[in-house]
Amino acid sequence: MQCDFRVHQDARLARVYYFTEVWWMFIFKFLEPKMLINSVLFLAIWSSSFAEESSSSDATSNKRAAMGFQDMRGNKNLIPTSLEHNKLSKRTLMDFQDNKDSNAPDIEDNLSHEFEKRAPMGFQGMRGKKGYLTPDFEDSYFRDEKRAPMGFQGMRGKKVVSDDDYYKRAPMGFQGMRGKKSLEEVLGEIEKKAAMDYYDTRDKKTYVFEYPEDYEKRLLASIRGKLKEFPMEWEKRAPMGFQGMRGKKSLLDEIEELEKRTIMGFQGMRGKKNALENYIDYYLDPDMDFDKRAPMGFQGMRGKKDSDKRAPMGFQGMRGKRNTGQRFDTGINFNIRSSNEYQGTNNRRNALASCQLEKRSPFRYFEMRGKKNPRWELRGMFVGVRGKKWATAPYEDDSPFISVFDNTERIGVDGDSPAILGNSIS
């Protein structure tokens, strides 16, 4: 753009020179000497004024940006849009409008070194980099000058370090901060502050005048001499007020809470009981129930159930082994013993044995998980329950007992029946 403008100026100067030459030739041929002098003066004045006008136009074109205000945030697109083309066509001459499309890359190259992202002077508080006119050694000086030297300093940035009289916490009041404080330090601070009537901390509002004048004196009179009355554990926290800070709890309070807890009620907590006491009780009396939990309350936790809490009769088909020696005698008559318990219970609740034999399931139902106590009429019909088979060690010498178990496989095959087997035994 600048090159085309200069070419256009050169064309205008060529026209002016041609016009002046023609004018001189006309003067020398047709005018008198007086008029010759006047015409020479006129041409000199006119040419000088034209030269000044052309130089001023060059200066203004160099000082001013090519188009538009370019002080906005971010980079501007150097390729001219349709609106910028229209504005440019109004400002430039008619000769320049014919070549505006072909001169777009030349405009971008010529203005790239003049186009800056920010204004060269004035306020530079926009987003982006700092001004290049500011030297490095003056950065610290300008940084300190940007914030207020006094007053409210709650802005973003660093605080002024020169304020030595500025305290970070209140001189009195709530002392529930993190950490431990000695009682002697607290009382010493109160005594020092009570000697002064007014605390001037940078013209801050204090609440001294809201209380009576002799309030602190009466407070000190009530506190002095009572340091030894406090227990030693109070030295680690504030003497009064909210004490919910981090630290240890009083041992007496913990003992009181333990006494209030687990006296009665729900005792279904996981844990072990004192193994020594249980072992001694079991060693002295093995038949006694081995209690693993508190004697009362809800006891639905993991582990064994108390024998008093078990169902005294009913279906006992739990997984496990049954003690055949406790259930039947080793004799031929298969007398039913009084105990109806599992292995290791040693004949408990003998009085309930007769009732347990009457509460069994009806005939011909043997499909449940576990073992039932069958009646004598059906004792040889179904043996396929979970668990081990009948033990043979105590009955090796009893030939009728062995023959009964040998004939169980032939029931219903050769016309045998439980009655026939019973007659053969008797």
UniProtKB/Swiss-Prot annotation:
Segments of this protein annotated with the region Disordered: 299-329
GO CC terms in record: extracellular region
Propeptide feature ranges: 1-116, 131-145, 160-167, 182-235, 250-259, 274-291, 306-308, 323-358, 390-426
Job of this protein: Tachykinins are active peptides which excite neurons, evoke behavioral responses, are potent vasodilators and secretagogues, and contract (directly or indirectly) many smooth muscles.
Keywords noted in UniProt: Amidation, Cleavage on pair of basic residues, Neuropeptide, Secreted
Tissue: Tachykinins (TK) are expressed throughout the nervous system. APMGFQGMR-amide is also expressed in the retrocerebral complex (at protein level).
Keyword Secreted: yes
Superkingdom per UniProt: Eukaryota
Protein name per its UniProtKB record: Tachykinins
Gene Ontology biological process terms from the UniProt entry: neuropeptide signaling pathway
Entry-annotated residues carrying Arginine amide: R127, R156, R178, R246, R270, R302, R319, R369, R386
Protein family: Belongs to the tachykinin family.
Annotated compartments: Secreted
